Amino acid sequence: MSLMDVLRQQDPDLAQAIDSEAERQRHGIELIASENYVSSAVLAAQGSVLTNKYAEGYPRKRYYGGCEFVDVAEDLAIKRAKQLFGAEHVNVQPHSGAQANMAVQLATLEHGDRVLGMSLAHGGHLTHGHPLNFSGKSYEIHGYGVDRETEQIDYEEVAEIAHKTQPKMIICGASAYPRNINFDLLRTIADNVGAILMADIAHIAGLVAAGLHPSPIGVAQYVTTTTHKTLRGPRGGMIMCSAEHGKNIDKTVFPGVQGGPLMHVIAAKAVAFGEALQPEYRDYMRRVVENAKVLAEALTNEGLRIVSGGTDNHLLLVDLTPVNATGKDAEKALDHAGITVNKNAIPFDPKPPMTASGLRFGTPAATTRGFGPNEMRQIAVWVGQIVRELGNKSLQAKIAGEVRELCAAFPVPGQPEYV
């Protein structure tokens, strides 16, 4: 009897929700840029007996007994992350990317310090200074963005704002930016004003690990990331820095912002890092980028405008203004057709965020499933048809059937029960 069989017997209501989600994943196309499918091995580690163990502290420096085996799991995660990214010091305990960012900020800043981060409206992240987030409430935030014409980061503007505001920290990285980030130039800008540079690579960590995006390791003083998204691990966070900053980071994570680490999640992180160290992982990331470029070109052929004119990484932003559609309406219509994306503001968007003029697409999950350029072109055709006729329910139903047929040829990894 499988664990899911046990759950179906004991808690059928919850089991039904999980079974329904598995079915949704199996029969639909996942194009949310921050999502991916983990392997059976990652699922096995995260669902293991390590979930029973409390382990406050760090390997061989715990506040509880009986930690000799969870120490092995954390040591493996740290060792593999160091090897994967070339970092001197790694903390794998943050429960999320947001908590990793919080820990770095608390370790280096005082309340009210000035911080320069990429505006959320231009592709940044909540934890980079949004007024509703802890970062925006704790520090004096100044924002930078993209050039109105190129829709790429305006590094001259970043330098000008930094010179004017004299921030203690500059944060780079993004949640909806399709171009490479020049970490070396940002470090120069930071050095010129005496600022710390923190790089949040949550979205592009897999590309960095595979050598397909410039690495901020050894450039930024602090690098944070999530462990899911392009890394295909469990949902969690991680901090990388030089050895000299390691002790301060560790004591800020614990006991500063967290108590007991999630040892089952850390074990799953170790599994994912081990998978990312394999030669086939780089090929996977290469195909992710190729698929994103093909999808961008194919959507352009459907009459849609791609923000910044294309993509260098795993995601792209589509401006729906040429087809008189909103991101909110397009997301809903595509969802009815079995294609999952998210509405997203575009730079200088006149519409409110919950309506938005754009859609964000990402190729990591579909590529994990085995989709290639031909499937990307077919997806673009479906997207074009749907956004031009948002109210056409029969068209959405027809495409949903075609999507289901396509997905049947590409089983979802990590779901042997449901294949």
Curated annotation (Swiss-Prot):
Keywords: Amino-acid biosynthesis, Cytoplasm, One-carbon metabolism, Pyridoxal phosphate, Transferase
Catalytic activity: (6R)-5,10-methylene-5,6,7,8-tetrahydrofolate + glycine + H2O = (6S)-5,6,7,8-tetrahydrofolate + L-serine
Modified residues (N6-(pyridoxal phosphate)lysine): K229
Subcellular location, principal: cytoplasm
Gene Ontology process terms (BP): glycine biosynthetic process from serine; tetrahydrofolate interconversion
SUPFAM superfamilies named among the record's database cross-references: PLP-dependent transferases (SSF53383)
Binding site for (6S)-5,6,7,8-tetrahydrofolate: L120, G124, H125, L126
Protein's cellular compartments: Cytoplasm
GO MF: glycine hydroxymethyltransferase activity; pyridoxal phosphate binding
Sites annotated Plays an important role in substrate specificity: H228
Reported cofactor(s): pyridoxal 5'-phosphate
Matches recorded under NCBIfam families: PRK00011.1
Subunit structure: Homodimer.
Main function: Catalyzes the reversible interconversion of serine and glycine with tetrahydrofolate (THF) serving as the one-carbon carrier. This reaction serves as the major source of one-carbon groups required for the biosynthesis of purines, thymidylate, methionine, and other important biomolecules. Also exhibits THF-independent aldolase activity toward beta-hydroxyamino acids, producing glycine and aldehydes, via a retro-aldol mechanism.
Protein's name according to its UniProt entry: Serine hydroxymethyltransferase
Species per Swiss-Prot/TrEMBL record: Herpetosiphon aurantiacus (strain ATCC 23779 / DSM 785 / 114-95)
